[in-house]
Structure formats: structure tokens, C-alpha cells
A protein has these predicted regions:
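Non-catalytic terminal/accessory regions
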Residues: 1-222, 229-234, 238-244, 249, ...
Length: 549
């Protein structure tokens, strides 16, 4: 399989090392029942994104081998999912090659389907990795993959009398008989319907509300968070149709009420109608469980605008272990929730995480503020929260999470007004700006604070190559002014993180300095006059030059 991109092609040496890695991961799975990869190997994979296609070749070979080594196949799929996710991160930072590599992966899937060299379940597993890694699929690529899936379907499996593929109809019926949890139903439906036309998915959504399987009906409110508007509208329509005590449970009503505030404004009237009908018909709303004790740990906002939150129950042999990835420019990027994790696993995972990033304990007020802010920012960009956010909200009693975006200007002034000694005079402001510049330049906690977008890379890659001082000046004059609001938001989120930390306090002036810098940025002060932005620009040029080598 080949790759047309600015990246080097994957070499025989890459293929050999990839093969060795898959066997190492398979061996770890046999010993510990869990995949793992050493830091050196992980770094090598990150530095060789073109090995995605070597991994795909290796996975295909392992899947088709006789006898088949299931651990080896599982190891290949795990590595593929990891590599797809790493490349998706680069795609989000506007690396042109990332789109080329991900398209090449999908094009090779189409070739595999046409050649029919794999069992259909193995091919669908490779396709589903795109869903696992949250890789966006272009509409034309989705259409091509769907056609490839149809071509690979045996002739007798085409359509049921209702127009649903027979295999899908059987899978949905099996879900109704075996599933106990509506959240798992939706996850399984996402896997089944990934390559379906959206109109067919909407039809299936409507049908879920009608059968005798209660768990399928319970899943319909969760589809109000589906990425596709037509599926969400279908879910709202069938819920209104079945809104009576016999078919619409109190939990379904509670979930519909919460999710109303997580979907676009223009879709909320349909939720209001079904809620009114349910109440008129006598459906009672399920009560929320009392908020339990909660340990909340939160990272600093990194240079990509990402902030991770981990939630655990502080006592007991087993407990809640949940997490969120909040992302500037996206919203709630990821969420996961497990209600019963052994305490030793929670402790080990938290210890490992703290070795990699700056974490601090925060409280519920901070959690509520940042989650609701990112729900709102995500909605403004057309990105609905993941379904697992609902699981988390129900687990911790977050009954009031809505789309509440922070007004960054007002928040900055409010936080500054509450500080002990707000910088107001020109001399105080200059001192504060100098301190923030020194901190951002030297503190390892913010070493990821730099620009890594296409604009910086274009300057660094320019031929003839710009002198360092010229590149720095152009980043300050051409790149950072367009990013001032993003950096101001990042600084306010950092100030909130510092204010609400329940651990030992960092220097008292640090939060104030962040807010002063945010205020100056939003006021339009040139980045070249702000020592912190000069430090960010210098680091941006340095990192871009390193990556260009």
C-alpha cells in the first residue's frame, strides 16, 4: 500500500519494527490481559505517522493468517487505533499531511473491501477504528466506504422487508434481547450504523421507540446527542409519539430535560413539546441521586487549549473513575465513565497521570464552570457533547449542567476585582506583565504553550529561510494577533484553575498576572509589547524549526 504525501514513505525497516511492536504488545496481552507499549516505542510511533499503513498491512496479514492468533490481531487493532488517534491530533493542528495519511487509510479500506481478502467482520473492525479514534470522515469518503460495505455484503443479506439491511435488523433485535444498559445500546448502534446513509439511521432511530424491548426505547433519548441533526429530529419525534407512562419512563423524561440544554437552540422546541405531552399524560420525572463525595483533579490548560479532568469517588474498594477532555475551539472533546473500578487501578492511573502533566485538585464550582463553558462553546461550533458526559452527570448528580459560556471580558474584570492587589497603575501593569513573561518563559508547567498551527509552519518553512529574529517578528505581527482571543481565554481558564485549586497555593500574584495579560490582549495591545507573548512566539519558532528538520 502506498502513500502520496510530504511525509517519507514507510520503509521495509519501518515494517519490520512495526511487526516487532505488534508481537511485543500481543505478548503483554497474554501476560497481563492488557495491551501496553513502552515510552521509547510510543515516541517512535509518534515520530513515524506514515507507519499507519505498515500497521494496516500487518493487521490484514494477521487477520487472514491460518492459524489465526487472536492476541496478535487484537494487538494490531490496538496499535492502529492509537496511531489513528495520534494522527487525528495532528489533523486538529492543521498538519496537511495528516489529512493525506487518514485519507490513504480509508482508500486502502475501500480496496480491501473490493478485493474481499478479509472476513467482513475484520473489515468492519478496521472501519470502526475510525470511530474509536474519532477521525472525521469526509462525506465523499463515507459514501465510498458505504458502497464498499454494500459490495462486500453477501447477496442474501441485502434488505429486510422494512428496508433495513437484514444483518442490521438481526443485530438490533439481538441488542434488545441481550442489552441491559441503553448507553451500551447506543455504542453498539454507532458501530453498526457507521456506514449507513443518515436517512436509514434516522429510520432505525424511529423504530427503536416502537418495539417491545424497553432497553431500546430507553436508548432513544440518548440519540438526542447524535452528531447528525436528522437523527436527533427523528429521536425527538418518536419520543413525542410514545410520551405516555406505558412507554416513556421517568428516567427518559429526566434525560430529555437535561439534554435539551446540550443541543442546538433551534431543536429545543421539539423537546419542549414532548416534555409537555409526557407531563400531561402523567409521566413523573425521575429524581436525581444526591451528589456524592467527589475527588476532582484537573490539568493546566495546555498549548493546544486542552484541559483534562478526572473524577473519582474518594473511598471504597471500587469506585467511580471518569474523565473529560475539554478543548478550546471544540468544546467537550472526549468523555469516559466507569462506575466500578477497583481502587488500586484508580490509584495507579492517577499516579501515572501526575507524572506526565501538571494536575491540581479543584472543586465542584470549578468543574461546573468549565464543563458548562465548553458545552456552550462546542454548541456554537456545531459540536455536541459526547454521550458519556450524560453518564458522568448522572453519576455525580450534576443536574444543572447547561450551555453557559463565560463572558471572558466580564470574567477577567470580576476576577481582577476580587484579587488582593489588582494591578491598576502603569507601573503595576508593567511589573505584572514582566512577571508573566518570566513565568511562561521558564516554568515547565507551561512548556507546551506555543503556536503549532499552519501559519507558523509556513513562516518557518519559507524559502529562502527566514532569519530567527525575522521569523519571530512575523509570528508576533502576523500570527499572534489573530489568536489573541484564544490566548486570553486560555489565561482566564488558567486563572480559574489557580483560584479554585484546593492544594497548596502557587505564588499569589500568578493568577493576577494571568488576568492582567488577558486584559491587555483583549484590549488590543500588540503582542510584541507583552513579554509572555514574545516568549510564546520564540518557543513557537523553535518548535517549528525542530519539526521541520
Amino acid at each position: 500500500m502506498t502513500l502520496a504525501s510530504p511525509l517519507p514513505l514507510h520503509t521495509p525497516a519501518d515494517t519490520k519494527r512495526v511487526s516487532a511492536l505488534t508481537y511485543a504488545v500481543a505478548s503483554a496481552m497474554r501476560r497481563h490481559n492488557a495491551p501496553s507499549l513502552g515510552a521509547v516505542d510510543q515516541a517512535w510511533l509518534e515520530g513515524r505517522p506514515q507507519t499507519l499503513l505498515s500497521l494496516l498491512d500487518t493487521t490484514v496479514a494477521a487477520s487472514a493468517a491460518e492459524p489465526r492468533d487472536e492476541e496478535l490481531v487484537a494487538a494490531c487493532l490496538w496499535l492502529l487505533a492509537n496511531q489513528l488517534e495520534l494522527i487525528r491530533y495532528k489533523l486538529e493542528r492543521d498538519y496537511d499531511w495528516a489529512s493525506v495519511v487518514l485519507d490513504a487509510y480509508q482508500e486502502n479500506l475501500i480496496v480491501l473491501a473490493r478485493a474481499q481478502t478479509l472476513r467482513s467482520e475484520d473489515w468492519f473492525a478496521l472501519v470502526n477504528l475510525l470511530n474509536v479514534a474519532k477521525v472525521p470522515i469526509r462525506p465523499e469518503m463515507s459514501e465510498a466506504l458505504a458502497k464498499a460495505a454494500l459490495d462486500a455484503t453477501p447477496p442474501g443479506e441485502a434488505l429486510s422487508p422494512q428496508g433495513i439491511p437484514a444483518e442490521v435488523s438481526r443485530a438490533v433485535d439481538e441488542l434488545g434481547r441481550s442489552a441491559k444498559d441503553p448507553f451500551r445500546v447506543v455504542e453498539e448502534l454507532a458501530d453498526i450504523g457507521m456506514l449507513m446513509p443518515v436517512e436509514l439511521r434516522a429510520f432505525i432511530t424511529h423504530e427503536l421507540g416502537l418495539p417491545s424491548h424497553a432497553v431500546l426505547r430507553e436508548a432513544v433519548p440518548l440519540l438526542l446527542l447524535d452528531p447528525e441533526p436528522v437523527v436527533r429530529r427523528s429521536a425527538a419525534a418518536v419520543l413525542e409519539q410514545i410520551a405516555s407512562p406505558q412507554t416513556f419512563s421517568p428516567v427518559m423524561l429526566r434525560r430529555a430535560l437535561l439534554l435539551r440544554n446540550w443541543i442546538p437552540e433551534e431543536e429545543r422546541a421539539a423537546i419542549d413539546r414532548l416534555v409537555r405531552k409526557a407531563r400531561v399524560k402523567g409521566v413523573e420525572c425521575a429524581q436525581w441521586a444526591p451528589a456524592s463525595a467527589l475527588s476532582i483533579q484537573c490539568t493546566i490548560v495546555d498549548g493546544s487549549g486542552a484541559q483534562s479532568v478526572v473524577l473519582t469517588t474518594p473511598t471504597g474498594r471500587i469506585g467511580l473513575f471518569a474523565g473529560l477532555l475539554l478543548k478550546q475551539g471544540f468544546g467537550v472533546r472526549d468523555a469516559w465513565c466507569d462506575l466500578s473500578v477497583p481502587r488500586r487501578e484508580i490509584t495507579r492511573s492517577l499516579k501515572e497521570a501526575r507524572c506526565e502533566m501538571a494536575w491540581r485538585m479543584t472543586g465542584r464550582d470549578h468543574l461546573n464552570t468549565v464543563v458548562q463553558h465548553h458545552i456552550a462553546r462546542g454548541l456554537a461550533l456545531g459540536n455536541l457533547p459526547q454521550l458519556q458526559l450524560l453518564e458522568i452527570a448522572e453519576a455525580i448528580g450534576a443536574a444543572d449542567w447547561k450551555d453557559r459560556s463565560l463572558d471572558m471580558t466580564a470574567e477577567t474584570e470580576q476576577l481582577l476585582a476580587g484579587s488582593c492587589a489588582a494591578a491598576t497603575s502603569p507601573a503595576q501593569i508593567a511589573l505584572s506583565l514582566r512577571r508573566s513573561g518570566e513565568w511562561i518563559d521558564r516554568d515547565p508547567m507551561v512548556q507546551s504553550w506555543f503556536e503549532d498551527g499552519a501559519a507558523v509552519r509556513a513562516l518557518v518553512d519559507k524559502r529562502p529561510r527566514l532569519k530567527p529574529d525575522v521569523a519571530l517578528r512575523r509570528v508576533l505581527e502576523e500570527v499572534l494577533p489573530a489568536r489573541r482571543d484564544a490566548w486570553a481565554e486560555r489565561l482566564v481558564l488558567l486563572a480559574l484553575w489557580l483560584r479554585d485549586s484546593t492544594e497548596d497555593a502557587l505564588p499569589a500574584e500568578l493568577s493576577q498576572d494571568c488576568l492582567v495579560l488577558a486584559r491587555e490582549l483583549r484590549a488590543g495591545r500588540p503582542p510584541a509589547e507583552l513579554p509572555a507573548m514574545v516568549a510564546i512566539a520564540e518557543r513557537s519558532v523553535f518548535v517549528a524549526r525542530v519539526h521541520a528538520q
